[in-house]
């Protein structure tokens, strides 16, 4: 049986193996040089921080919130948190709403916050509402340091003093950490109505790295530029720890005062750092493609036509990836491919540093045309699939096995099954909910036993995503079996709280489900209480069957939805970006008879969305975004 390593065991193992190799790269903004930190140096710094945290009074199992842009010290500091036996609570720098930050810091019971100068104003704003927080630790120097704030250098100094007299105590602390101890509480889709702080253990992380080895690998000299937020476990597993396990290295994009400034730093960082591998999400993939094509168009119509001709032929030659060059006509295409690669695509790849081998795509599902595009230019984008509750990797395409449109080969060792709405396991090719079982499955949701019990049943993680197995290895994800919303930028959100409130707080709404699958905005599908709406129309002196009355009914439904927006009486209950911007009013209620409810009286989302696909597509048009439209009028 494989040894159940902690992250501490894991780091010690690979630092011993690759001690003098570079692990971290960071750009020195004064010299414009990317400077390395070796494996050994990374661990020494992490241990000094860990000892400093112990000197500060951090106890084993205590929570430390982490709010910062990517940098070397993000990785080193987190290792310090873990070596101190504490639990890291990484927070997204996208969180701009005070109540979202307050909720996470309070709900996690964080006693300390580690942050940067750019995020400090947010932290200072929430501290009056977070009485449990004792200290704020800063990565950067600030001129107006408060009494409860300290710089990371002070923690390191305290750590050196602690190690000088208490080294045995420090070693005892980190050696006491077990594989089932919590490493992380990840808030990826929590709401105040239904908190989802995902508990990930040390073994969850190390197990998923071992599983990731079954699908993808890198070389010892490879460099990865991490352009995704470091707070997500995807960056941890596919980035920090997998690269460490191969003796490879990682770099982070220099931060900026804002998200836009950080985005502007990506392109020059790629050119300077010349990565071999990058993690990506669909939004970034689209931006890279757009940038490449803009550059091509500036070279004139002749070059642009040649580029398009080369691209068309490369896509035809590659087919579905795994079967490229298998037709008779491809015998004649192959010399062309070599020529196109040398004359055109090599120059295109220079736009991404010139050393790129492949992308690993995560977050949301990657458009198949984007996969074909990147494969054609010689930098495959291997689609993967996962979720934080699985730490997160469940499957991935790889150089050895890839099929465009698939989510890749399921990692090993891990069990997987596909269940229909009644819990019956499905054969190859049949769709249902994706369920997985393995050491990468989370310990549960922090302070939420009900959601834990609903999500992990007899060790099986019910992902809420719909898919099917092509064969014993290849997984296809086709949508959501349950509720998860996914925005165009890959951000995810669990909408049950909004849905429940829409029904509970309105006598005019009997049922509601939200939908967002990388779309411009979220929409709501609601079943109206027609009797209550008719009574409302009559109270206005209108005949409920007339168009005038139905318009008033729809306007009332819009008011009910708007009560959660600014100016509404329930404003602030939920993040505004996830509130529905359009409403589909459905003609019939959900029942067991029409199969929209299962035997447990739960809505079968996939069936509802399939039945009202046309309504949903219409909701993403200018006419459909207005609740007063022909489809909605016809439903009343």
Model-derived features: positions:
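Conserved ATP-binding/catalytic segment of the ANL
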Residues: 188, 410, 421-429, 433-487, ...
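Conserved AMP-binding/adenylate-forming core of the ANL superfamily
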Residues: 24-71, 79, 96-102, 151-156, ...
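Structural core segment of the AMP-binding/adenylate-forming
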Residues: 56, 83-158, 172, 562
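Conserved AMP-binding/adenylation subdomain of ANL enzymes
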Residues: 206-223, 230-338, 342-345, 355
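AMP-binding/adenylate-forming catalytic core of the ANL superfamily
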Residues: 113, 438, 443-444, 454, ...
């Amino acid at each position: 049986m494989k040894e159940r390593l902690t992250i501490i065991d894991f780091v010690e193992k690979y630092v011993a193996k690759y001690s003098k190799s570079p692990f971290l790269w960071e750009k020195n903004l004064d010299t414009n040089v990317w400077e390395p930190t070796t494996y050994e140096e990374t661990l020494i710094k992490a241990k000094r921080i860990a000892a400093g945290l112990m000197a500060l009074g951090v106890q084993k199992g205590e929570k430390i919130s982490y709010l910062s842009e990517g940098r070397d010290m993000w990785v080193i500091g987190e290792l310090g948190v873990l070596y101190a036996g504490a639990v890291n609570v990484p927070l997204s720098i996208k969180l701009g709403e005070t109540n979202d930050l307050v909720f996470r810091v309070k709900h996690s019971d964080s006693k300390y916050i580690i942050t940067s100068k750019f995020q400090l104003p947010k932290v200072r704003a929430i501290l009056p509402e977070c009485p449990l927080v004792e200290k704020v630790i800063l990565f950067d120097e600030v001129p107006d340091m408060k009494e409860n704030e300290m710089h990371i250098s002070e923690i390191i100094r305290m750590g050196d003093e602690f190690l000088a007299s208490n080294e045995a105590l420090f070693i005892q602390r980190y050696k006491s950490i077990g594989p089932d101890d919590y490493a992380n509480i990840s808030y990826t889709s929590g709401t105040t109505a239904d908190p989802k702080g995902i508990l990930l253990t040390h073994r969850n992380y190390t197990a998923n790295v071992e599983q990731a080895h079954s699908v993808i690998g890198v070389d010892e000299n490879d460099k990865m530029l991490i352009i995704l937020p470091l707070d997500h476990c995807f960056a941890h597993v596919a980035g920090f720890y997998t690269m460490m396990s191969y003796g490879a290295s990682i770099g982070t994009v220099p931060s900026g005062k804002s998200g836009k400034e950080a985005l502007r730093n990506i392109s020059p960082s790629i050119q300077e750092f010349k990565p071999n591998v990058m993690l990506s999400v669909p939004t970034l993939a689209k931006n890279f493609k757009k940038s490449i094509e803009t550059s091509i168009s500036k070279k004139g119509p002749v070059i642009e036509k040649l580029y398009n001709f080369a691209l068309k032929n490369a896509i035809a030659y590659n087919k579905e990836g795994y079967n490229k060059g298998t037709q008779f006509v491809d015998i004649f295409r192959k010399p062309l491919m070599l020529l196109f690669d040398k004359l055109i695509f090599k120059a295109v790849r220079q736009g991404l540093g010139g050393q790129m081998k492949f992308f690993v795509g995560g977050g949301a599902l990657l458009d198949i045309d984007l996969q074909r595009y990147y494969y054609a230019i010689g930098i495959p984008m291997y689609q993967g699939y996962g979720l934080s509750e699985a730490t997160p990797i469940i499957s991935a395409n790889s150089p050895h096995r890839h099929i465009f449109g698939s989510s890749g080969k399921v990692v090993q060792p891990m069990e997987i099954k596909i269940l229909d709405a009644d819990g019956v396991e499905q054969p190859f090719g049949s769709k249902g909910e994706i369920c997985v079982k393995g050491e990468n499955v989370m310990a549960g949701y922090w302070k939420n036993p009900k959601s834990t019990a609903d999500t992990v049943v007899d060790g099986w993680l019910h992902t809420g995503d719909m898919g099917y197995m092509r064969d014993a290895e290849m997984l296809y994800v086709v949508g959501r079996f349950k509720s998860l919303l996914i925005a165009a930028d890959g951000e995810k959100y669990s909408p049950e709280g909004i849905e429940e409130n829409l029904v509970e707080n309105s006598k005019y709404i009997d049922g509601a489900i939200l939908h967002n699958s990388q779309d411009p905005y979220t929409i709501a599908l609601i079943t109206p209480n027609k009797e209550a709406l008719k009574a409302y129309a009559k109270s206005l002196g209108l005949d409920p069957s007339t168009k005038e009355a139905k318009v008033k009914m729809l306007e009332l439904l819009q008011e009910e939805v708007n009560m959660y927006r600014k100016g509404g009486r329930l404003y602030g209950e939920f993040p505004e970006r996830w509130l529905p911007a359009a409403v589909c009013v459905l003609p019939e209620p959900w029942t067991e008879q029409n199969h929209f409810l299962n035997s447990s009286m739960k809505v079968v989302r996939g069936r509802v969305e399939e039945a009202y696909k046309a309504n949903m597509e219409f909701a993403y048009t200018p006419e459909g975004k207005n609740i007063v439209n022909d489809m909605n009028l016809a439903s009343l």
